[in-house]
UniProtKB/Swiss-Prot annotation:
Primary gene name: rplX
Record HAMAP family: Ribosomal_uL24_B
Family: Belongs to the universal ribosomal protein uL24 family.
Full protein name: Large ribosomal subunit protein uL24
InterPro entries: KOW, Rib_uL2_dom2, Ribosomal_uL24, Ribosomal_uL24_KOW, Translation_prot_SH3-like_sf
Gene3D superfamilies in the record: 2.30.30.30
Subunit structure: Part of the 50S ribosomal subunit.
Length: 104
């Protein structure tokens, strides 16, 4: 299946405690069906002190299910993603709500 959400996409969270918030995709894990989104689903991690890093409690992003996020269109609203083949043979993604091209 083609990737509907890619690294660098602007996405909106649909469900969960961060519902309605938006952020940029940092990393996608297609086999697990999860993605990391900057500033979303933050968890506290207890970091042990090392020689080059001090210890303490740090906040970092945790993975979020791909089904709980949607690509944001030009207006910042969640949209479904479709695929189109252009005249020159390239396959590009487009927003189903507005019809605008997402990449390419």
């Amino acid at each position: 299946m083609a990737a509907k959400i890619k690294k660098g996409d602007k996405v909106v969270v649909l469900t969960g405690r961060d519902s309605g918030r938006s952020g940029e995709v940092i990393q996608v894990l297609p086999k697990e069906g999860r993605a990391f989104v900057r500033g979303i689903n933050l968890v506290k991690k207890h970091q042990k002190q090392t020689q080059n890093q001090e210890g303490g409690i740090i906040s970092k992003e945790a993975a979020i299910q791909l089904s709980n996020i949607a690509v944001a269109d030009a207006n910042g609203k969640p949209t479904r993603v479709g695929f189109r083949i252009l005249e020159d043979g390239r396959k590009v993604r487009f927003a189903k709500t507005t019809g605008d091209q997402i990449d390419g």
